[in-house]
Amino acid sequence: MDFTTLVIIGVYLLVFIVYFAKINTSMCTISISGASVEISGCDNPALFEILPNLKPFDHGLSVPSI
């Protein structure tokens, strides 16, 4: 992966985390440590249904394969 690919993926994840944090701030604890994101204390089961199904590259985000 080159730098551009990492930036695109990073921005995508950041937007998703911020968006989700605004929806579930009272329900979830989101801790970011280095490259790993840990979401805990969620009362909303939809979170665990959505996360495994997320495919960043299916939403019009095209990253050339290296």
Swiss-Prot record:
Topology, Lumenal side: 1-2
GO BP term, example: transport of virus in host, cell to cell
Cellular component GO terms, alphabetical: host cell endoplasmic reticulum membrane; membrane
Record's signal peptide: none
Cytoplasmic topological domain: 24-66
Its job: Plays a role in viral cell-to-cell propagation, by facilitating genome transport to neighboring plant cells through plasmosdesmata. May induce the formation of granular vesicles derived from the Endoplasmic reticulum, which align on actin filaments.
General remark: TGBp1, TGBp2 and TGBp3 seem to act together for cell-to-cell propagation. TGBp1 is the main movement protein that physically cross the plasmodesma with the viral genome. TGBp2 and TGBp3 would facilitate TGBp1 function.
Family assignment from sequence similarity: Belongs to the Tymovirales TGBp3 protein family.
Subcellular localization: Host endoplasmic reticulum membrane
Lineage: Viruses, Riboviria, Orthornavirae, Kitrinoviricota, Alsuviricetes
InterPro entries the record matches: TGBp3
Parts of the chain that traverse the membrane: 3-23
Keywords per UniProt: Host endoplasmic reticulum, Host membrane, Membrane, Transmembrane, Transmembrane helix, Transport, Viral movement protein
Organism: White clover mosaic virus (strain O)
UniProt protein name: Movement protein TGBp3
